[in-house]
């Protein structure tokens, strides 16, 4: 019973934290009609898409956040010694966080359903295929960025500062990046392209410059994938056992 109450309390707190972002948008649009040409429904769709992307990441890939911890306490040695692919072991071992992100699924899907109807977002199988493609690439991009930052633990044992940077950038992309200075737009589009997790997919679904943005998304995901592999291989070579 105590466990169930803790579970409910944690999820309720998480839902309330997510709803703060929704309430902030509602408050802003109670004062203005548009945010840099973005309507309230479009901004909420963008936020809901990001919640869904993060929920999928937290379901399947959250163990990448524990790379630094495993390196520090020596558990990473166990992955290397086993006759299995090290990366596969990282993803398939016991979850870093035992609770599944039901809150992010619920709030994210609710926002998408509610706003998609008002925006007439889905109008045929093509739009559904496009949505699935954008969701997959957004999750991959989000995973890749966090994986790269976590893999820096091979050189910087305490790499939490890099994850903190990502968390701060996440707060920025809760709103369309059009509202920010050009320097910030470049930072979240090219340097650390976390805007791939929701802004660019949203623009694509809204039909604004879809072809060029699709090429950018696909190209960026390929580049991120290559960087993932290179950094991982370099890190594995640089790794020194805690018992060495």
Regions found by a protein language model. Name each.
Residues 1-244:
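Hydrophobic transmembrane alpha-helices and immediately adjacent juxtamembrane helices
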């Amino acid at each position: 019973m105590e466990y169930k109450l803790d579970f409910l309390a944690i999820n309720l707190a998480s839902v309330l934290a997510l709803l703060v972002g929704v309430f902030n948008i509602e408050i802003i649009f109670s004062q203005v009609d548009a945010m840099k040409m973005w309507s309230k429904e479009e901004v909420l769709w963008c936020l809901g898409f990001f919640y869904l992307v993060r929920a999928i990441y937290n379901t399947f890939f959250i163990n990448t956040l524990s790379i630094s911890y495993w390196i520090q306490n020596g558990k990473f040695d166990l992955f290397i010694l086993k006759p299995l692919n090290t990366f596969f072991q990282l993803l398939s071992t016991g979850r870093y966080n035992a609770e599944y992100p039901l809150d992010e699924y619920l709030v994210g899907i609710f926002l998408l359903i509610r706003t998609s109807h008002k925006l007439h977002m889905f109008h045929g199988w093509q739009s559904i295929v496009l949505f699935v493609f954008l969701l997959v690439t957004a999750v991959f991009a989000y995973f890749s960025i966090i994986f790269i930052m976590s893999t820096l633990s091979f050189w910087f044992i305490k790499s939490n500062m890099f994850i903190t940077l990502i968390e701060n950038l996440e707060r920025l992309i809760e709103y369309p990046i059009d509202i920010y200075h050009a320097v910030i737009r470049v930072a979240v589009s090219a340097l650390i392209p976390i805007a791939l997790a929701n802004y660019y997919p949203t623009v694509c679904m809204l039909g604004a410059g879809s072809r060029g943005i699709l090429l950018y998304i696909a190209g960026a995901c390929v580049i991120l994938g290559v960087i993932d592999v290179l950094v991982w291989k370099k890190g594995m070579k640089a790794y020194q056992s805690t018992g060495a």
